[in-house]
């Protein structure tokens, strides 16, 4: 493997294009395409952009040549899994596994898609995202909206097997809908998705916490 850091010209081009991209994001994309509209619209447009660009191979090649930086010092191994670098995207942003092709080509070391659930889930009523400018942060209450693990996991498998260097994992959650029942139902809900994910991604990850109906709602649903 030839590393970008070991090739003077490739390294110089990578640095210049990265600086250009950073400038363009700060002064053009961020003020005119993200913060001039609601967070929900900005998120949807970003996903749509990834869905379109992933089908343009010359553009993906160009992204990889310009933005993907490789250096042996960035490589790491965690619990037997090799990563090209430690920079990645955690679960929550790419719920339906639409972004791996683009992220792989711009140099991400890993992505966790989802969270996904055993059944398709509409999530909470919109808006899902609320900016908190005084804290430079955002409040999120999507409520596990996703197309369901029967759809998302095959996409993750395809992305993982075709990725050039990025590791792809899947976050598994309990379905957040009116069918949510008791503890046994919840365990089986997880198991359905875990069985679907077995051997089809680098790893399957249950989230440490998730939005779901309250315990009282669950008991009421189970009694119906």
Describe each PLM feature range.
Residues 109, 114, 202:
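Short acidic/polar active-site loop segments enriched in Thr and Asp
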Residues 79, 86, 90-94, 114-116:
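Acidic/polar N-terminal loop/beta-strand segments that form early-domain functional surfaces
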Residues 99-106:
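A short acidic, amphipathic alpha-helical/loop segment
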Residues 38, 89, 111, 152:
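Conserved, mostly hydrophobic/aromatic
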Residues 83, 91-94, 104, 143-162, ...:
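Conserved alpha/beta-domain cores
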Residues 15-76, 137-140, 145, 149-150:
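An N-cap/entry alpha-helix motif that binds or orients negatively charged groups
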Residues 3-23, 61-88, 153-165:
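N-terminal amphipathic alpha-helix/helix-capping segment at the start of soluble metabolic enzymes
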Residues 114-166:
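A gly/proline- and charged-residue-enriched helix-loop-helix capping module
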């Amino acid at each position: 493997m030839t590393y970008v850091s070991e090739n003077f010209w490739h390294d110089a081009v990578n640095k210049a294009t990265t600086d250009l991209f950073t400038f363009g994001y700060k002064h053009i994309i961020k003020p005119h395409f993200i913060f001039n509209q609601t967070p929900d619209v900005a998120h949807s447009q970003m996903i749509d952009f990834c869905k379109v660009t992933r089908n343009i191979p010359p553009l993906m090649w160009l992204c990889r040549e310009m933005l993907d930086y490789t250096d042996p010092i960035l490589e790491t191994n965690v619990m037997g899994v090799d990563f090209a670098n430690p920079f990645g995207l955690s679960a929550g942003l790419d719920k339906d596994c639409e972004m791996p092709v683009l992220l792989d080509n711009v140099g991400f070391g890993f992505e966790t898609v989802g969270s996904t659930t055993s059944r398709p889930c509409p999530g909470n009523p919109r808006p899902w995202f609320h900016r908190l400018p005084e804290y430079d942060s955002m409040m999120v209450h999507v409520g596990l909206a996703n197309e369901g693990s029967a759809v998302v996991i095959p996409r993750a498998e395809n992305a993982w097997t075709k990725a050039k260097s990025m590791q792809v994992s899947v976050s598994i959650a309990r379905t957040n809908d009116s069918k949510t029942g008791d503890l046994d139902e919840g365990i089986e809900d997880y198991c359905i998705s875990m069985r679907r994910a077995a051997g089809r991604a680098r790893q399957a990850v249950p989230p440490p916490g998730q939005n779901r109906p309250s315990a009282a709602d669950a008991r009421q649903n189970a009694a119906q």
